[in-house]
C-alpha cells in the first residue's frame, strides 16, 4: 500500500475504530460498517487495535489516520529498545494458560502487573481442562491467584466455550498468553468465521504468511467485543517504575509506604514492611520471589519516575 497523499481540506474526517493492526497498516471500521485500510500520517505515535481514530479517506478503500482519539487505557509491553502496543481502550485482560504446553508463571505475573497499571479487570482462563491429570496440577498451581481475588475460569474451548460468555458481556476484552495455550481455539469457538475474516485481511494489509501475528478485534454482539493478540513469550515492563511494579502486586499495597526507608525496594532492606509481612505469612513467598525477578530484569537507567504509571495518549 502506497503512502496516501494529503486529502482535500474540504473532505470531512471520518471517525472509526481500529479492528486490525499489522505494523504501520491498520484496518479501520467506520460508523457505516465499511472498512478502510489506513496508515498513520507522518511520524505520529503508534496506534493499536481498539483505538478510536479520525481518518481521511484517500481512495475507495484506503485512508490515512490523522488523529488518535483519547484512550481510556493502553495495554503494551516494552523492552530496552522498543514498545509493542497490544490493545487500546480494553476493559478486561483475559490471560489464557493451559496445562500443556506448560505455562510461565512469571509471564502471568507480568501480564497481571501490566493490567493493574492500567486499572483493567483480569480473568485467568485455564484452557484444555479435558486433559484431566495435567489440569488438576495446573489448577493447584493457580489456586494462589484465586486467593488474591483474581477470577480463575477452567474451560475446554474445544468442547464448550459457553462458560466464558458471561465474562465477556459489557467488556472489550483482550486475550493474551503464550503460543499454544488455545487462544485461537477460543476465538474460533466464539467467532465461527474468524479464520475467514483473518484470511481476508492478509491481502488487504499485505501481511502474507505473517497474518497470524497481528491483533484483531471481533464484535460478538453489541455489548461484547474481544481482541485476539499474537502469542507472546516475553512481556517486558521497562516502561514501569519499581513503585508501579510493586503496586501491580495487589496484596503488597497495604504495606507500601510503611517501610523504614522511603526508597525501599523490598529487596532485603532493613525495616521493610513487605518482608515483615512475608515472615508473618501475610504475603506469599512465591509472589515475593516473582516480584524480585521482575525488578531484577529492569534496566534502572530507563525506569521512569514513580508518577509515570500509565501511558494514555
Swiss-Prot record:
Keyword Nucleus: no
Family annotation (CDD domains): S1_YloQ_GTPase (cd04466), YjeQ_EngC (cd01854)
Subcellular localization: Cytoplasm
Binding site for Zn(2+): 259, 264, 266, 272
Claim: Nucleotide-binding is one of the keywords in the record: yes
Gene Ontology biological process terms from the UniProt entry: ribosomal small subunit biogenesis
Alphabetical list of PROSITE patterns matching this protein: ENGC_GTPASE (PS50936), G_CP (PS51721)
Annotated Gene Ontology cellular component terms: cytoplasm
Parts forming coiled coils: none
Residue ranges of domain CP-type G in the record: 82-235
Needed co-factor(s): Zn(2+)
EC number: 3.6.1.-
Domain of life: Bacteria
Cofactor comment text: Binds 1 zinc ion per subunit.
Xref: InterPro entries: G_CP_dom, NA-bd_OB-fold, P-loop_NTPase, Ribosome_biogen_GTPase_RsgA, RsgA_GTPase_dom, RsgA_N
Signal peptide segment: none
Record: residues binding GTP: 127-130, 177-185
Pfam families the UniProt entry points to: RsgA_GTPase
Keywords noted in UniProt: Cytoplasm, GTP-binding, Hydrolase, Metal-binding, Nucleotide-binding, Ribosome biogenesis, RNA-binding, rRNA-binding, Zinc
PANTHER family in alphabetical order: SMALL RIBOSOMAL SUBUNIT BIOGENESIS GTPASE RSGA, SMALL RIBOSOMAL SUBUNIT BIOGENESIS GTPASE RSGA 1, MITOCHONDRIAL-RELATED
Quaternary structure and partners: Monomer. Associates with 30S ribosomal subunit, binds 16S rRNA.
Family: Belongs to the TRAFAC class YlqF/YawG GTPase family. RsgA subfamily.
Protein name, as recorded: Small ribosomal subunit biogenesis GTPase RsgA
Upper lineage: Bacteria, Pseudomonadati, Pseudomonadota, Betaproteobacteria, Nitrosomonadales
